[in-house]
Amino acid sequence: MFALGSFKTFIGKCREDSVARNQMEAKCRLATAALLVRVATVDSDISEVRSKQLHRILRSRFGLDDSSATQLVEDAHAAERSAIDLYQFTRLLNRALDDKGRHQVVQMMWEMAYVEGRLNGFEANVIWRTADLLGVPSRQRVEMGQQIAAERSILASS
């Protein structure tokens, strides 16, 4: 009888851990999407090209269908509008992601910034501040940006 009770406790704990993990993943997706929205809108309203890129990034990186990506974008716009600063997003991502995950967030931001083939100072500043808050070294941040810029110029000339 004792073993059965312990097993039930173990199963209950596994379910709780699974729910908590799913909730944390959803929060990380929202925080990442909100940072991408910040990059996309920092200098103006979001253009159609940027909107499509935002959906594309979220679908490919998080394995979302169109409906889920659209809902995440709507939620991200609301979260970004109500945010006082970047810290509320980066604090969560720092707790939940390893170095590789934090680097991927910065890479997604570069992909968002360079979608139209150019980078402005506002976008660069948001990426710099976010990377700094995420603990991504300046050299790696710059290298990621240069790599994305090179890829964009190759695609644009093709």
Positions of predicted regions on the chain:
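Small-residue-enriched hydrophobic alpha-helices in membranes
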Residues: M1-R38, V42, S47-S158
